[in-house]
A protein has these predicted regions:
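Ligand-binding "clamshell"
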Residues: 23-24, 37-50, 112
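Active-site-proximal beta-strand/loop segments in catalytic clefts of secreted hydrolases
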Residues: 30, 50-52, 101
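Solvent-exposed loop/turn segments at secondary-structure junctions
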Residues: 15-17, 33-36, 51-55, 68-69
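Secondary-structure end/capping motifs
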Residues: 70-135
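A bilobed periplasmic-binding-protein/Venus flytrap-type ligand-binding module shared by bacterial periplasmic
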Residues: 58-75
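Short beta-strand->loop
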Residues: 8, 44-56, 67
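Short helices/loops that flank or line small-molecule/ion binding pockets
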Residues: 1-4, 8-32, 40-41
């Protein structure tokens, strides 16, 4: 018998109240979103980071075709430089970044966005250099 025999997969959509009501034991999400939402709603959580188990997160990756890198390297370089400048600004000006997000989506919580910026700062510097996995 394996641990997998004890697991029941439940389709929950985005109804996180099923987690709050302990109908489901585990909730998958982004470190800068659902754990903060849960804490702010009064539900303490234990966050398990995929990076602690050898897997990174695909969110925030910049992906392009090898063909684009070969045929238009300046476009690729300029896009990456601009993206990193945006990250640097947002992480150095968390309040502005949170306000900007709310301007684009008024249903967002300022407190949540501000806390999310702190989590994102840790995640974007995971390997010691923002924007790089290895040197």
């Amino acid at each position: 018998m394996s641990y997998a025999d004890d697991i029941i997969i439940v389709g929950v959509g985005d109804n996180i109240s099923l987690f709050y009501e302990e109908i489901v034991d585990v909730w998958s999400g982004y470190a800068w979103d659902e754990p903060i939402e849960s804490e702010l709603a009064g539900y303490p959580v234990n966050t398990i980071y995929t990076s602690d188990h050898g897997a990174g997160s695909y969110a925030g990756f910049i992906v392009t075709k090898e063909e684009t890198i070969i045929n238009n390297p300046s476009l690729v370089k300029n896009f990456i430089v601009a993206s990193l400048k945006g990250w640097d600004y947002a992480l150095e000006n968390k309040e502005d970044a949170a306000k900007y997000a709310i301007e684009r989506n008024p249903s967002l919580s300022y407190e949540h966005q501000l806390l999310a910026m702190g989590v994102l700062e840790d995640l974007t510097n995971y390997h010691g250099t923002r924007g790089c996995f290895n040197k």
